[in-house]
Amino acid sequence: EVLSINCSYSKEGKYPSHNLISKQHRPKSKLVINSSRGEVIDYSEIVNTSIVFNDVWTNEPKISPSDIFSFLDNSNAFGTPHIAGYTFSSKERQIDLILKKFNDIFSKSVERKEHKKLKRLSSCLPEKLTNSKNLDFKSIILEVLSTRKISVEFKALLYEFKRAGKSFGSKDFEKLRKSKMRQGFDDICIDLPMDKQLLEKMELSGFQKYEK
């Protein structure tokens, strides 16, 4: 039903991933999610037979706005500006890796002074949902991260540039991407009552247990 692509990109070697998913290698999946590299799938072709959610684009950051706009103009197409892993927690993990490398190279034991602060789930949801006795997984996820909304905003911005006769360049793409830095699921703690089944789904998705 769902094909999620997370591989590295290569044009050579025994198993090149360039155009791994294409007209010649069309997936049977109803939904294709690409968060690897834009060149891994021919998204303009695959969107004709599958719902495609694309987070990465050909020739980033020197993208082709017209190609992306044409892709997003399909009813089966959704796209975001390379933000799949663009969270505060991922940045913190990068800092931890850099700090570890520094300590290893210079035989130091420098520690971070700042510690990760979790955001409460209740602060991410509207009041009508936090007060609901029937919380459901889909409603929570759509409130915490509405990728569909981001896709609509992305397309609208491309259209705005096009209408104004301006070129949407690499700097504009990076500016948009940086504006979408967000709380990852692992940055959020569960502080609302919910049944065991829902709690398990939330924790499997990365949400943290609330500790008083």
Language model segments and positions:
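Rossmann-like adenosine-cofactor binding region
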Residues: 1-69
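A generic structural signal for short coil/turn motifs at secondary-structure boundaries
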Residues: 12-14, 86-89
